[in-house]
């Protein structure tokens, strides 16, 4: 179990945690990943891994959509007690609020779907772990609350909660 927790910590870090929260019935705009993640972003969060002390995280991101419509998101991740690292997302919109893509931390495809101001992403990781990530967009479209859960054999081994802000 300790190895799975350590792997979760090292493999992902840059998103968030917790159980999914219901979207509020506010005037928040729909979550369109290729719009929100375009430009520079800054994320601050707390990573909780079973049998470990919670660790702070800081993620800087730069995203842009290519002519082919694929969102390229490059991230620099700093986690308390670990060396900094980089990772890349490539997300392709499929239409009707659905997405597919890749992540350097994932061991298989990333899939996603939106419902109103929420984006749900899910993907497998090494060691038989599964990730579910929910991002909820604020009413002004400038901030997303990121809640991420990592499970192994159906048991939660790590969670991350992060606030992501657009800075350009």
Segments predicted by a language model, with ranges:
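Bacterial signal peptide processing site
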Residues: 17-20
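Bacterial N-terminal signal peptides that target proteins for export
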Residues: 1-6
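C-terminal motif of bacterial Sec signal peptides marking the signal peptidase cleavage site
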Residues: 12-15
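Central antiparallel beta-sheet cores of small beta-barrel/beta-sandwich binding domains
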Residues: 44-126, 131-134
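Edge beta-strand at a domain terminus
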Residues: 135-143, 147-168
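N-terminal helix-cap/turn-to-beta initiation motif at the start of protein domains
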Residues: 24-40, 139
């Amino acid at each position: 179990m300790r190895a799975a927790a350590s792997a979760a910590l090292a493999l992902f870090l840059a998103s968030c945690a917790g159980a999914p929260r219901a979207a509020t019935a506010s005037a928040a705009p729909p979550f369109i990943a290729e719009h929100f993640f375009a430009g520079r972003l800054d994320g601050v969060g707390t990573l909780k891994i079973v049998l470990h002390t919670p660790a702070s995280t800081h993620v800087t991101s730069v995203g842009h959509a290519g002519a082919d419509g694929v969102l390229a998101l490059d991230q620099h991740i700093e986690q308390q007690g670990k060396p900094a690292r980089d990772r890349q997302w490539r997300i392709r919109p499929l239409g009707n609020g659905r997405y597919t893509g890749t992540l350097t931390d994932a061991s298989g495809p990333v899939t996603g779907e939106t419902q109103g101001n929420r984006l749900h992403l899910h993907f497998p990781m090494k060691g038989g772990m599964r990730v579910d990530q929910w991002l909820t967009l604020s009413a002004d479209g400038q901030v997303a609350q990121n809640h991420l859960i990592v499970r192994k054999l159906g048991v939660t081994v790590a969670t991350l909660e992060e606030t992501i802000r657009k800075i350009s």
